[in-house]
Amino acid sequence: MAHLPKEYDFSIESLGESKIPSPIYLSHTLGDFIPNYVSDNEYISHELSARLGETVGPFTHKNLMERAGPRQKIFFNPHHVHAGIVTCGGLCPGLNDVIRAIVRCLWGRYGVKRISGIRFGYKGLLPDYNFDILPLTPEVIDNCHKTGGSLLGTSRGGGNRVVDIVDGIERLNLHILFIIGGDGSQKGAKEIADEIKHRNLKISIIGIPKTVDNDISFVQKSFGFDTAIVKATEAVAAAHMEARSQINGIGLVKLMGRESGFIATYTAIASHETNFVLIPEVSFDLDGPNGLLAHLEKRIALRKHAVLVVAEGAGQDLMVNADGVPSGDSQGGSLRVSSGTDASGNKRLADIGLFLKEKIGVYFKEKRIHINLKYIDPSYLIRSAVAAPIDSIYCERLGNNAVHAAMCGKTKMIIGLVHNKFVHLPIDVVVCQRKHVNPEGSLWRDALDATGQPIVMKNII
């Protein structure tokens, strides 16, 4: 019987047939030392694993991912194109690098001279806010990669006002809109593309996935993630130095990761100084003989210091009682679990960092064991950082491939890296689920080896 991966439809929507010769001079010939065009019949499979004795296939354009890159024929006449760029959601290292790459490729490779920066996220397309449009030229974006944040500004929310947003796109007479944003922003991009199709407009919507949590499905790595690991590792190094310099010192570092613990996991492996890493995907007990606090006590007794790294979404089940108030916090206070979601559609979380800080302090006080705990939350220092060189390279390539896709009339898609190849991915497939750390996979196993923590910190009932 054929061994098939779970069925997904990776077909990419197009505005029509590409008939215009590309202004980029490339080749189809191997061995002539000229970069080659990419054909629309070049694909890769999202599933690499196979089992002996089982056949793989059949393959179609639906279960294969379309290769990204410049085509020989394009859909839009570059001299007629008006392109827009918008950044949505929170800050992330590399935003300006992506903007710069898009502008330079449009202007320098395709000859597109009308490029508009939409200010402050989706709200920049809404008439209520009346934000100015920022004309983008090579001179404007030349040095923007040297600073963090977003040249265009950003905001959360507004993406649910799809009709108003498409009205704004029409008012600006945009032919292409590049949407740089995370899961919530790309869900908005999907709705925008659907409304554009409903109106029978020839406007390309191209997403560039932005999430420092690295939780976009199918995408191997999100831009800014490598920079986040660099900065997070620096925070852990500081926590370790504080901990080992004190009597029974404990360093507690809270990192980003609402539903996926990739930053915490990679940081634990990279730092070589983390003794416990806690992520949303792996539940743990606080109390009891096999709980976190008992194991932390053993670590302090043995080595006289400890470092804990916790993702912001970890341990949420420990903080909520039947009344919706975090356990150990009868007054509610800063740990209270807020109902509903934020402007980006994310579920509001209780603060696991402050919760653990309090619980650790109470536990050792009751045990009459002196500790010196230092708590570090570097989240906004990480988000606003300038992209590391490895991320700058990635952002440049993401931006270039996004432009190539848009000029060919591709739409309702994002650019992603899969198996080290840039591909086109349909937005509706990407946003249907989030990527998580597999508790039974090799990454988490390696993290456990790096920290030396127990494989399971749950009490057997």
UniProtKB/Swiss-Prot annotation:
Cofactors that this protein relies on: Mg(2+)
Pfam families: PFK
Pathway annotation: Carbohydrate degradation; glycolysis; D-glyceraldehyde 3-phosphate and glycerone phosphate from D-glucose: step 3/4
Catalytic activities: beta-D-fructose 6-phosphate + ATP = beta-D-fructose 1,6-bisphosphate + ADP + H(+)
Top EC category: transferase
List of catalytic residues: D213 (proton acceptor)
The gene coding this protein: pfkA
Record: residues binding ATP: G90, R156, G157, G182, D183, G184, S185
Entry protein name: ATP-dependent 6-phosphofructokinase
Top-level taxon in the UniProt lineage: Bacteria
Alphabetically ordered keywords of this record: ATP-binding, Cytoplasm, Glycolysis, Kinase, Magnesium, Metal-binding, Nucleotide-binding, Transferase
GO BP, one annotated term: fructose 6-phosphate metabolic process
Binding site for substrate: T211, V212, D213, M256, G257, R258, E312, Y380, L381, I382, R383
Provenance organism: Treponema pallidum (strain Nichols)
